[in-house]
């Protein structure tokens, strides 16, 4: 029988995959306190190129997707993890950050933190296990010059 925390982790895998629009051919890095468990769950679902933060290699912009499970942790601690993740992500990478349900001010802080690192917020969602946002690197949205 699985523990409630792992079962909760299992419940966020499908929504995170759907939000990111992941394919089994993409390289995925998973961060957060349960990153190994989430990586193994992704492997069971056929995402064999998924790696946990602890075994993701050297940062060379090799990952297409970052899935960050940041439930039961502070947004301040997320800053350090986000800084660390940046060099692992390709110029067209997507980022999904899953957090506990938050007050509007905390959501704005999260959005500002993600935007500060060169991401454009594409979508946000609320789920029974918390809330998540999807962001893409701003290089994926080139600035159009005026005529």
Predicted regions and their residues:
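Class I SAM-dependent methyltransferase Rossmann-like catalytic core
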Residues: 1-25
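Core SAM-dependent methyltransferase catalytic element
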Residues: 113, 117-147
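A short acidic, Gly/Pro-enriched loop at the edge of an enzyme's catalytic core
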Residues: 55-76, 80-83
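Conserved class I S-adenosyl-L-methionine
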Residues: 23-37, 97-120
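A short, well-structured beta->alpha microelement
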Residues: 11, 15-16, 34, 39-62
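A short glycine-rich, Lys/Arg-flanked "PGG" loop and its adjoining helix->strand segment in the class I
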Residues: 77-94, 111
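Short acidic, S/G/P-rich loop/turn micro-motifs used as interaction or catalytic elements
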Residues: 35-38, 69-76, 101-104
């Amino acid at each position: 029988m699985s523990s409630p925390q792992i079962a909760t982790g299992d419940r966020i895998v499908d929504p995170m995959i759907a939000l990111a629009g992941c394919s089994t051919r993409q390289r995925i890095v998973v961060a957060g306190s349960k990153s190994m468990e989430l990586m193994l769950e992704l492997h069971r679902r056929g995402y064999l190129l998924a790696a946990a933060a602890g075994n993701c290699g050297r940062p060379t912009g090799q990952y297409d997707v970052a899935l960050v499970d940041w439930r039961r942790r502070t947004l301040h601690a997320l800053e350090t993890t986000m800084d660390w993740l940046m060099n692992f992500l390709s110029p067209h990478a997507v980022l999904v950050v899953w957090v506990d349900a938050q007050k509007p001010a905390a959501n704005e802080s999260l959005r500002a933190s993600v935007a500060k690192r060169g991401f454009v917020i594409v979508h946000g969602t609320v789920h029974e296990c918390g809330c998540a946002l999807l962001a893409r690197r701003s290089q994926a949205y080139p600035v159009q010059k005026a005529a």
